[in-house]
Amino acid sequence: MMAEAGKEQEIVLKGHMGTHFDVMDKEFPLSYCVLPAVLFDVTSVPADREITAEDIDTSLLRKGCFAGFCSGFSERVPYGSRAYHKEHPQLSYDLIDLLLDCGVSLIAVDFAGLRRGKEHTPADQRCADRGAFVIENLYGMSRVPKDVTALTAYTFPIRLIGSSGLPCRVVLGSD
């Protein structure tokens, strides 16, 4: 138990707590601080299957946009719990590739990552290699009114020297 707690503390000290993104081997471009945004309500996707392109309106995706996925998971499952890290929703690899093919700059989820377990880091690296960052644990997307269609995402990372994760603040505003 102590070894597991030590591992969790090490992860937190490297910037992987709360809303953050994994730096991978890239640098966050300042041009990503303000982006047009689209939110996808995926609360109706059953927990026993991946979120796929069929679950969203892909025509809303634009090159250089912020794509947020609101599953409601972070509001139902306690942050930091075993279930939060092991049972969260996942985006299918086909959907991840579609987002990257569309040129999405930021992919935000209200859960612990695009993929679970051993697939988490490779999925983040896949995005980073294509110029996209993944914002994890973005709480509160469900508060954005469903009828708001023109959104801007303001994303402000907090630089931590030597960290592999950057805590960030994200504000979604309507145009």
Regions found by a protein language model. Give the residues of each.
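Active-/binding-site microenvironments in catalytic and ligand-binding cores
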Residues: M1-D175
